[in-house]
Amino acid sequence: MKLIVVTTPTFFVEEDKIITALFEEGLDVLHLRKPETPAMYSERLLTLIPDKYHRRIVTHEHFYLKEEFNLMGIHLNARNPKEPHDYYGHISCSCHSVEEVKNRKHFYDYVFMSPIYDSISKVNYYSTYTAEELREAQRAKIIDSKVMALGAVSYTHLRAHETRGNL
């Protein structure tokens, strides 16, 4: 199982220390998601995180940060749906249906499938997937190691997925 954490959409005091501690405890990948914030704040945060962890950070905004800070890659979403011209490197994206996962996952290093559970960070953002739909997508090999669950994934949910062997 790969542990990926997505940041809160806003910055907070000592966020760099918490991110560093997560990496020290085994975090695989951090997705830096700070929509509608000036790039300079992301730059400042990245300068406070040890360089050795930058190769494990994916940015959702301000794609130039990938090169400037030697980050792992970029993440495409509704706000930023296309990679920069002549971009080479890791790309992930967000998907919101089984059909979208099926059609897009082959073009990316991995995709987020969301929301698997009702969101705890977005108001009125509810899961539309049934357990049977997820099982069928797994049987059809639509859900595989390139598909990451997103949306209120908690320790309890992680244990359930680990037991079932999906997402």
Listing of model-derived features with the role each one plays in the protein:
Residues 52-53, 87, 143-144:
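Helix C-cap/helix->beta junction micro-motif
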Residues 69, 78, 90-139, 145:
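Glycine/Thr-rich beta-alpha phosphate-binding loop at enzyme active sites
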Residues 1-73, 79-81, 91-93, 99-107:
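Conserved N-terminal beta1-alpha1 strand-loop-helix module at the mouth
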Residues 31-33, 138, 162:
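Short, cationic motifs built from Arg/Lys/His that form the positively charged side of catalytic pockets
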Residues 156-163:
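Conserved small/polar residues in nucleotide/adenosyl-binding loops
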Residues 148-152:
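Glycine-rich beta-strand-to-loop/alpha-helix junction loops that act as flexible
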